[in-house]
Each structure stands twice: as C-alpha cells, then as structure tokens.
Amino acid sequence: MTEFPKIIMILGAVLLIIGAVLHFVGKMPGDIFVKKGNVTFFFPVVTCIIISVVLSILLNLFGRMK
C-alpha cells in the first residue's frame, strides 16, 4: 500500500511534463494554420512527423530489450 502514493505522484509529474511539452509542440513552424472568416483549419504536419519519429524510436528500443 505504500507504493500507491508514489505511483500517483510519478504519474502526476509525467502528465504535467507531457502537458507542458504538448503546449509548445502544437505551435511549431511547418504546421498548417488557415483562418478565413468563421472557418479555422489546423493541421499539425511537423508535429505529427516528430511524434511519429519519437514513438518509432521508443518502440524500437523497447522491442530490442526483450
């Protein structure tokens, strides 16, 4: 039972860090943002590429550990 508070604190810290990183990631150069009148279109091209590369590297590293 003493491990549960530690897990909750670590999970909270991880979520806080992820939230801070994602706040800045969505505004990268290369992301498409078009606003005309009432219509707003946002497509995070560069953000998607960076997330894909990072996830590919992490999954590749975790796959090799087995």
UniProtKB/Swiss-Prot annotation:
It is found in: Cell membrane. The chain crosses the membrane at residues 6-26, 39-59. The gene is yrzS. Disulfide bonds: none annotated. Keywords: Cell membrane, Membrane, Transmembrane, Transmembrane helix. This is Uncharacterized membrane protein YrzS. It comes from the Bacteria. It is a multi-pass membrane protein. InterPro entries: DUF2905 (IPR021320).
